[in-house]
């Protein structure tokens, strides 16, 4: 069976669950979304007829999902991203396709739950991943989860997955000092990034750098900024402050206004825009500030 997944911390959790549950994974394909269709084509060229998909949003790639369903014997999707209401209507009739989508937690939590894995170490690790991936900023382990994510990006995901499975899902003995050093180093970089790469427009903060982005999001949210938008290589990462009283309908309306579609995480969604940077930032600044004013939102 092929495993097709993302390349982030939640994808690592999915790999741990999938590789623990199944011993017949022939190959794992990762995508960072920039090569999404290319990786789908690689999977289509692979002789393995069974595909497990985890932590991938097909909102912009429905044609790719259709190709997989039409050309493989079995396709199973575990995901946590939001989709338009009728997105799966035609696909759910396909006998070789099944999906398990739960937007209340991360994809690795869904895998862990559905696979009924009984291991306390993995359970705790999945909890940490869920806290980070769904941005539970009021959880007591939120900053520990942030540190785990920083450390994760210094590792090879396949090698790390293999190591954790072999070591009963325990992090290396040097994890804490090495991860804390990464945190401390990033904090030293923040002041310079704030001076050169951070611009505020009303309740919106724009960050023109991917370095220390999450740290800046946390800080700006503490300052009661409603939105923080990271922009790098035509990718726009929108992070919504959960301390503001946005309802589910508000968040759906917001994503529709920003992206023209309702998919992705309601508080943390990403889209690509290859048009003029200045014009897009101007559009977002006006749109989001007007959105807050029109609805008379207030931060808690």
Language-model features and meaning:
Residues 126-197:
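Hydrophobic, aromatic-enriched interface-forming segments
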Residues 89-157:
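Short alpha-helices
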Residues 8, 18, 55, 79, ...:
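Divalent metal-coordination and catalytic microenvironments
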Residues 39-43, 62-68, 216-220:
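A short acidic, amphipathic alpha-helical/loop segment
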Residues 56-89:
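Active-site cofactor/cluster-binding pocket
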């Amino acid at each position: 069976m092929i495993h097709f997944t993302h390349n982030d911390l939640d994808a690592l959790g999915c790999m741990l669950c999938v590789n623990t549950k199944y011993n017949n994974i022939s190959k794992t394909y990762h995508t960072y979304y920039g090569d999404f269709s290319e990786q789908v084509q690689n999977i289509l060229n692979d002789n393995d007829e069974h595909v497990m998909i985890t932590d991938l949003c097909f909102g912009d790639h429905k044609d790719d999902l259709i190709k997989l369903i039409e050309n493989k014997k079995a396709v199973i999707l575990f995901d946590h991203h939001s989709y338009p209401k009728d997105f799966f209507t035609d696909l759910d009739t396909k006998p070789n396709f099944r999906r398990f989508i739960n937007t209340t937690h991360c994809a690795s939590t869904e895998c862990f739950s559905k696979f009924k894995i009984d291991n306390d170490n993995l359970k705790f690790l999945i909890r940490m991943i869920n806290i980070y991936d769904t941005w539970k900023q009021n959880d007591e382990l939120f900053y520990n989860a942030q540190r785990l994510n920083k450390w994760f990006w210094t590792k090879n995901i396949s090698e790390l997955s293999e190591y954790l499975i072999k070591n009963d899902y325990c992090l290396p003995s040097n994890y804490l000092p090495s991860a804390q050093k990464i945190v401390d180093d990033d904090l030293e970089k923040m002041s310079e990034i704030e001076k050169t790469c951070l611009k505020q427009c009303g309740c919106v903060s724009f960050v023109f750098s991917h370095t220390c982005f999450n740290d800046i999001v946390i800080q700006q949210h503490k300052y009661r900024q409603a939105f923080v938008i990271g922009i790098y290589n035509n990718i726009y990462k929108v992070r919504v402050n959960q301390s503001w009283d946005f309802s589910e309908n508000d968040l759906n309306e917001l994503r529709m206004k920003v992206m023209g579609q309702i998919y992705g995480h309601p508080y943390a969604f990403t889209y690509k825009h290859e048009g003029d940077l200045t014009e897009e930032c101007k559009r977002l600044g006006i749109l989001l500030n007007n959105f807050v004013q029109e609805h008379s939102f207030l931060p808690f």
